[in-house]
């Protein structure tokens, strides 16, 4: 696919699609709640539609209208054995959280996905769930999908110190803990996104959060809710960077989710001297959201590492692009988690942006980016990773001559089906 290039400035306003993490979880909580849950501004992208498909296979009635998703909850005990394996496609969130949800059910389940999912590590979820009494294993006894979950297990409480900062692992344990006897205590290594914890409260449950420690009791029941999913800050990040680095730009992004566990990119933009303003912030059905305005800025290099990394882990590919247009060196560290995403994002970012003229050195846990460098035409690939594909389209906006050809552009539909249309809508 030929990407959009050499456009002088992006100007206008858009509303980015609903938050991917929250869209997944809204279906999950709607399913395990009693009664009806109505979800607006749901992300109708491949990953989240896969979560709907999985719960339909488990016997949950889910209606889809133009404006809403309506989930008729069954409670945990109303979930039924699927007729065959659950195919969750490309979604790491779905497979890992479903492992927690299904660990305590009274039937067996096999969960599988695409070739990317088959390469992603699942021991980080399986091992703590097995400590709670779950029985599950990967293909041929490995840690890789397909994952077989043997039901009819009685889950017990545990106290767990997380070895990695992962919201997916934490959420899988929480879902299992809701079905276990007693109170489970989780100690996070670093603070990660807390949508699962907030949704427990939104759906009428109880959970204690004190710094990095979480306490959750088993045997809880939930009640269906009405909710509006705010815009995904991870999707907004591509337009934030586009607005900062494309000459003559000013972009307004409306109804963007502002959960503090997700807004690390705002802090980085401020460190680098970028113009980013948040206005009209409000709580929509309990969720903090607002309008983000960015404009073309002169940027300087910075160092990114430590406890900010979980707050911007998904934005690092496009932050790396931002750094190529900043004066000086930017160092990103403590981000080894990028190696086990849809692809090895450390290598993918360095390889593809270097093809376009960037000066990036990959490291064991991050990237060293030397700026400022002009970018030129090249043939690039997304590696089947939505965030790499979208980052490369933003990079292409800076190319003045020649074409940028992207292999595997279809990956973008995993999280942002209208991405290329929204880019075109902002062209001067």
Curated annotation (Swiss-Prot):
3-phosphoshikimate binds at residues 20-21, 25, 166, 168, 314, 341. Catalyzes the transfer of the enolpyruvyl moiety of phosphoenolpyruvate (PEP) to the 5-hydroxyl of shikimate-3-phosphate (S3P) to produce enolpyruvyl shikimate-3-phosphate and inorganic phosphate. GO terms for cellular component: cytoplasm. This is 3-phosphoshikimate 1-carboxyvinyltransferase. Belongs to the EPSP synthase family. GO terms for molecular function: 3-phosphoshikimate 1-carboxyvinyltransferase activity. Keywords: Amino-acid biosynthesis, Aromatic amino acid biosynthesis, Cytoplasm, Transferase. Pfam families: EPSP_synthase (PF00275). Monomer. One of its GO terms (biological process) is chorismate biosynthetic process. HAMAP family: EPSP_synth (MF_00210). Its EC number is 2.5.1.19. It comes from Listeria monocytogenes serotype 4b (strain CLIP80459). It is an enzyme of class 2 (transferase). The active site is at 314 (proton acceptor). Its main location: cytoplasm. It is found in: Cytoplasm. Phosphoenolpyruvate binds at residues 20, 92, 120, 168, 345, 387. InterPro entries: Enolpyruvate_Tfrase_dom, Enolpyruvate_Tfrase_sf, EPSP_synthase, EPSP_synthase_CS, RNA3'P_cycl/enolpyr_Trfase_a/b. The keyword Protease does not apply. Signal peptide: none annotated. It comes from the Bacteria. It catalyses: 3-phosphoshikimate + phosphoenolpyruvate = 5-O-(1-carboxyvinyl)-3-phosphoshikimate + phosphate. Pathway: Metabolic intermediate biosynthesis; chorismate biosynthesis; chorismate from D-erythrose 4-phosphate and phosphoenolpyruvate: step 6/7.
């Amino acid at each position: 696919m030929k990407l959009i290039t050499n456009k002088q400035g992006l100007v206008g306003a858009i509303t980015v699609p609903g938050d991917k993490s929250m869209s997944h979880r809204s279906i999950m909580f709607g399913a395990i709640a009693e009664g009806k849950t109505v979800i607006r501004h749901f992300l109708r992208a491949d990953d989240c539609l896969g979560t709907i498909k999985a719960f339909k296979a488990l016997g949950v009635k889910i209606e889809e209208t133009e404006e809403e998703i309506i989930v008729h909850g069954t409670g945990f005990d109303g979930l039924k054995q699927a007729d065959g394996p659950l195919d969750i496609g490309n979604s790491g969130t779905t497979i890992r959280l479903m492992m927690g949800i299904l660990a305590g059910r009274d039937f067996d389940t096999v969960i599988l996905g695409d070739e990317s999912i088959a390469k992603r590590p699942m021991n980080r979820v399986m091992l703590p769930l097995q400590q709670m009494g779950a029985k599950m294993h990967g293909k041929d006894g490995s840690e890789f999908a397909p994952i077989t979950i043997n039901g009819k297990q009685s889950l017990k409480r545990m106290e767990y110190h997380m070895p990695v900062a992962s919201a997916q692992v934490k959420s899988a344990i929480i879902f299992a803990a809701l079905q276990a006897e007693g109170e489970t205590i989780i100690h996070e290594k670093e603070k990660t996104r807390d949508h699962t914890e907030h949704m427990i409260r939104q759906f009428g449950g109880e959970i204690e959060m004190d710094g990095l420690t979480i306490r959750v009791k088993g045997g809880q029941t939930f009640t269906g809710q009405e909710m509006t999913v705010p815009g995904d800050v991870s999707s907004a990040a591509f337009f934030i960077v586009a607005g900062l680095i494309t000459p003559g730009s000013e972009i307004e992004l409306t109804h963007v989710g502002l959960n503090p566990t997700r807004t690390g990119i705002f802090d980085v933009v401020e460190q680098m001297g970028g113009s980013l303003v948040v206005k009209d912030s409000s709580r929509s059905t309990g969720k903090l959201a607002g309008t983000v305005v960015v404009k073309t800025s002169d940027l300087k290099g910075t160092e990114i590492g430590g406890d900010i990394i979980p707050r911007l882990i998904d934005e690092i590919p496009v932050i790396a692009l931002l750094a190529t247009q900043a004066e000086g060196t930017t160092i990103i560290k403590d981000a080894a988690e990028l190696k086990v995403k849809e692809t090895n994002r450390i290598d993918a970012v360095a390889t593809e942006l270097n093809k376009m003229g960037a000066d990036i050195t990959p490291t064991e846990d991050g990237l060293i980016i030397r700026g400022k460098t002009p970018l030129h035409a090249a043939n690039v690939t997304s590696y089947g990773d939505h965030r790499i594909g979208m980052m490369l389209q933003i990079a292409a906006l800076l190319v003045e001559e020649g074409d940028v050809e992207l292999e595997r552009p279809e990956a973008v539909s995993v999280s942002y089906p209208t991405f290329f249309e929204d880019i075109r809508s902002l062209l001067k």
